[in-house]
Amino acid sequence: YGAFTADGSEYTGQFDISRTELEDYHSLRWELACEGPSDVLALETLPSLIEIEVLMNLLDRTPDKEAWVSLSCPNGKTLADGTSLETVAAVVGDRRSVLALGVNCLAPALVEGLLRSIRGVTDLPLIAYANSGEVWDSGTRNWLDTAPARPVDTGSWRAIGCQIIGGCCRTTPDDIEKLA
């Protein structure tokens, strides 16, 4: 939902909307997504426990669909809204239709620690797709080239059990090829 608002709330999980309004927002999009022949739904860049709960309720009502869940954890420790990963795992981890849990839209340097934390609270397969490493400056609305000039080593991610690895903001096909 936060990316839809384009107000930065996708980075904080602080939505100026009621739970009912959030349910209404996602219900229509969920119905449209489920009408198609999709095998797996990607529920990604989720910054808020309330949004995760809303989406899990929709998933529970659609037993023929499966999904992976990817979290927004910009501080490298918790969900963007401050919710612990243990709490998120308790909400997500016991659902048969959740195929994997992980993180996306974050600096590559934060991925390993978050995957270790998630692995400590769930046995679900792990996923990670990090940004390029550049930093978004919300004041100027520009990317700052702060990324190290070296490829990301995903070997430690794989060792923790990460099975899906990709790229998010500002990554290129060449970046993805280097991850393979």
What are the roles of these predicted feature ranges?
Residues 1-180:
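Domain-level signal for soluble alpha/beta catalytic cores
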